[in-house]
C-alpha cells in the first residue's frame, strides 16, 4: 500500500490551492502534532492538516493567533513584542461577549482555504479546519466550562443555496453540546464582504433572534463562526443572547482579520 501511494503521488502530484504549484505529499514524513501544545504549536498543526492542500511554502505563510493579542476581542497585534492587553477599541467600547479567540490571521493562505471551503463547495476541508478549531478551543476553555456551542446561523434561503452551514460543520463532531436551533436568522442580509465597519453593523442589526430563550438563560455559550472581521455578526448574535439572560457569551472563529 505504501509503495502504491508513493507511485500515485509521483505520477499525480497535488496542486497548491494558493499558488497553483504542483507538489508531492508523503504521509509517512508528516509526523502530525496531536494538538496545539506540541512543538510548533498551531502553525505546525496547520501545516500538517493542510499538507494535501497547500504546498510547504504557502502552508508556512499561516500566522497563528499567538500572543500578544487583545485579552477581550482576540485582535492579533501587528507588533509581536509584549504581553496580552486590551486593544484601543476594547478600551473605548464595551463588548457584549466575554472573549473572542481564533486560530490565526485571515491572510492569503487561510483566506484561500476558507474561500474554497465556504464558496467553492470543498466541504472536505471542513475536517482539517475542524481539527484546527478544536485545538484552539482546548487551549482557551477548560473542559466542561461551556454549556452550549452555538454556530452562527445562515438565512434559510442562503442555506438552501449553499447546502451547508459552514460554522456548524466545523463543530458538529463536538457532540450534544452543539445546538444549531438556538439562534435563527430572521431576515436576509447583504454579504458582509466589501462593506465598511459601520455598514456591517447596520447590515446585521436586528437580523437574528433566539428561538429558545429559556435554553440560554444562565448558560455559558460559545458562539462559533468562520471568520471574525469587524466582529459585527458575532457581536449582534452575542447581544441578543445576553438580552435573553445568557450568563456569558464567548466567540471562537477560524480566522481573525488584522485591522
State what each model feature region is.
Residues 1-225, 229-259:
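Glycine-rich phosphate/pyrophosphate-handling loop used in enzymes and phosphotransfer proteins
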Amino acid at each position: 500500500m505504501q509503495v502504491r501511494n508513493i507511485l500515485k503521488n509521483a505520477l499525480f502530484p497535488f496542486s497548491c490551492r494558493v499558488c497553483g504549484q504542483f507538489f508531492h505529499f508523503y504521509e509517512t514524513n508528516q509526523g502530525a502534532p496531536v494538538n496545539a501544545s506540541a512543538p510548533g504549536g498551531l502553525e505546525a498543526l496547520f501545516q500538517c492538516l493542510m499538507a494535501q492542500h497547500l504546498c510547504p511554502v504557502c502552508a508556512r505563510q499561516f500566522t497563528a493567533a499567538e500572543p500578544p493579542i487583545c485579552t477581550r476581542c482576540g485582535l492579533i497585534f501587528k507588533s509581536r513584542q509584549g504581553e496580552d492587553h486590551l486593544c484601543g477599541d476594547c478600551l473605548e467600547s464595551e463588548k457584549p461577549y466575554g472573549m473572542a479567540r481564533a486560530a490565526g490571521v485571515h491572510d492569503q493562505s487561510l483566506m484561500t482555504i476558507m474561500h474554497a471551503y465556504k464558496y467553492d463547495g470543498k466541504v472536505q476541508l471542513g475536517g482539517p479546519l475542524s481539527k484546527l478549531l478544536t485545538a484552539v478551543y482546548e487551549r482557551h476553555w477548560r473542559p466542561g466550562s461551556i454549556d452550549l456551542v452555538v454556530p452562527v446561523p445562515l438565512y434559510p434561503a442562503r442555506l438552501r443555496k449553499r447546502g451547508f452551514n459552514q460554522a456548524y460543520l466545523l463543530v458538529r463532531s463536538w457532540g450534544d453540546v452543539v445546538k444549531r436551533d438556538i439562534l435563527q436568522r430572521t431576515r436576509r442580509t447583504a454579504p458582509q464582504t466589501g462593506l465598511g465597519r459601520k455598514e456591517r453593523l447596520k447590515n446585521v442589526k436586528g437580523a437574528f433572534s433566539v428561538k429558545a430563550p429559556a435554553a440560554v438563560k444562565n448558560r455559558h455559550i460559545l458562539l462559533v463562526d468562520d471568520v471574525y472581521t469587524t466582529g459585527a455578526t458575532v457581536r449582534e448574535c452575542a447581544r441578543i443572547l445576553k438580552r435573553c439572560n445568557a450568563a456569558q457569551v464567548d466567540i471562537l472563529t477560524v480566522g481573525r482579520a488584522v485591522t
